């Protein structure tokens, strides 16, 4: 069986940051890559080229950091948590779960028009600049430089939406996407439903589905004859609760050491995280293997499958698994937000010509 062609995602470099994200934002065509010099050897298909992004996406509203005065004006509750740093800038204590949750609520209100957002104690509190970066890059992936692509007609599936519902919220508010959001935790979906009910701008745009099988990814969620332009996922990172707890402690220790203090008690990570959000049997590698295997069952129903990949060593087994399937295209984007590096792995069973026809049929203005 032939191996998938591997391509790179191209994007323009922004000179200035956009102050706010507009609803149904248009995707600009990426600049054309310079032709390769003669004699240069192209990477082999079994060694995918990884494009590294050392800054946030050019359309990311948080490209220049947090505007705390504007955020406090939009969400006055944030003022309690904002303090000057030794360097004279304003910030919050990122080891304080309540401070981070309040910052998220302020960001969502100021930049994305979400007036009410809350999560249960212990639930995953996502870093919004990094999460919306994923959304922007898969929007570029979907458009493939096609200026006529109507983003607000896209249907998107979020696997494991959690209690925060962050990807449906951002995708709806930035690009006008229609979402199906799934999770194995009914309590998480109940919280997302509450967020939807408290924000009229989200109503009628996000459908929630309970995954009945905690060992499945797409099976039991994607219905017959259903179509999605994109699937998104932030897989559980750890292989056990013990591993997740150790990771939490290590991250908080690093936060405390960066402030010149030490951890005196069992800390809570600012990102939090319930069991299903943090770990699963086999960890990220097994989850991705299941996702890739099941994606073949829905090859003609989903234009692009995508997932975050936190551990670089998990990319190789993913490439190997995709090479065994009839996958046409595999793309990898390595994103960097501060000191954290993560990757978007994307694959499609449709050829470039078929993807163009798909967009013309379903996403034309």
From Swiss-Prot:
GO terms for molecular function: 23S rRNA (adenine(1618)-N(6))-methyltransferase activity. It catalyses: adenosine(1618) in 23S rRNA + S-adenosyl-L-methionine = N(6)-methyladenosine(1618) in 23S rRNA + S-adenosyl-L-homocysteine + H(+). It comes from Shewanella baltica (strain OS185). This is Ribosomal RNA large subunit methyltransferase F. It comes from the Bacteria. Belongs to the methyltransferase superfamily. METTL16/RlmF family. The keyword rRNA processing applies. Its main location: cytoplasm. Keywords: Cytoplasm, Methyltransferase, rRNA processing, S-adenosyl-L-methionine, Transferase. The gene is rlmF. Residues 1-49 are annotated as: Disordered. HAMAP family: 23SrRNA_methyltr_F (MF_01848).
């Amino acid at each position: 069986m032939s191996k998938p062609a591997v391509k790179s995602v191209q994007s323009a470099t922004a000179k200035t940051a956009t102050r706010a994200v507009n609803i149904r934002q248009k995707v600009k065509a990426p600049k054309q890559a310079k032709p390769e010099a003669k004699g240069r050897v192209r990477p082999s298909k079994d060694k995918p080229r990884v494009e590294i992004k050392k800054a946030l996406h050019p359309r990311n509203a948080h490209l220049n950091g947090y505007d705390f005065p504007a955020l406090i004006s939009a969400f006055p509750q944030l003022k309690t948590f904002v303090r000057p740093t030794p360097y004279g800038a304003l910030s919050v204590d990122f080891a304080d779960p309540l401070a981070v949750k309040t910052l998220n609520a302020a960001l969502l209100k100021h930049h994305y028009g979400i007036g009410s957002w809350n999560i249960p104690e212990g639930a995953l509190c996502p870093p919004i600049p990094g999460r919306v970066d994923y959304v922007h890059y898969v929007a570029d992936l979907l458009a493939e430089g096609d200026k006529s692509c109507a983003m607000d007609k896209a249907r998107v599936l979020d696997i494991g939406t959690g209690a925060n519902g962050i990807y449906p919220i951002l995708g709806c508010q930035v690009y006008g996407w229609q979402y199906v959001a799934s999770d194995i935790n009914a309590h998480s979906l109940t919280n997302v439903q509450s967020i939807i009910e408290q924000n009229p701008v989200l109503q009628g745009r996000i459908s929630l589905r309970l995954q009945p099988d905690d060992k499945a990814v797409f099976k039991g969620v994607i219905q017959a004859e259903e179509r999605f332009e994109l699937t998104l996922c932030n897989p559980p990172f750890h292989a056990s609760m013990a591993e997740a707890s150790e990771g939490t402690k290590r991250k908080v220790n690093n936060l405390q050491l960066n402030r010149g203090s030490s951890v005196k008690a069992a800390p809570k990570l600012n990102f939090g995280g319930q069991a299903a959000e943090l770990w699963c049997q086999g960890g990220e590698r097994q989850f991705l293997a299941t996702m890739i295997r099941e994606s073949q069952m829905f090859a003609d129903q989903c234009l692009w499958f995508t997932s975050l990949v936190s551990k670089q060593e998990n990319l190789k087994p993913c490439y190997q698994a995709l090479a065994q399937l009839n996958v046409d295209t595999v793309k990898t984007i390595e994103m960097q937000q501060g000191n954290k590096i993560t990757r978007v792995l994307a694959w499609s069973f449709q050829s470039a010509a078929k993807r163009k026809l798909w967009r013309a049929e379903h996403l034309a203005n």
